[in-house]
Amino acid sequence: MHRLEPYQLWLGHAGDLAGVRSILDAGICAVVDLALNEPAAHLPRDMIYCRFPLVDGTGNDPWILLSAIRTTANFLKLDVPLLVCCSAGLSRGPAIIAAALSIVTLKTPEDCLRQVSKSVSHDVSPGFWNEVVGVCHSLHEQPPAA
């Protein structure tokens, strides 16, 4: 797991979800799991666990992408200690974190991915990134809910 300062935010991989003790020791209260190809994590009952089964490539339902991005952004806005995981922690996790940060900071997803890459290495799938950016741009174009 890698902490992304200055946020209460960690990026991890599927193996990190097996290490419940390290998650609890870090003070993490919520997990966003993005890997369709991994089994669901077995976490303590009092931990918030949100699973959004995303493919590391193209073909994801926009509503699932939107839900993953908004959920991550809401946890960030509320300053909830959050772990975002995907299989290897290199593609889906960094992309969804960048999209969520773009909502929170009002910066572009590209700028936010550059910010994430200062803390962790990534290898975001181009097809997946294009889908994420498309959903992000549609979010920025929507008027705020009344």
What is the predicted role of each segment?
Residues L139-A146:
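C-terminal domain-closing interface element
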Residues F75, D79-A98:
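A phosphate-binding catalytic loop at a beta-strand-loop-alpha-helix junction
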Residues H2-P81, S102-G134:
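Cysteine-based protein phosphatase catalytic domain of the PTP/DSP
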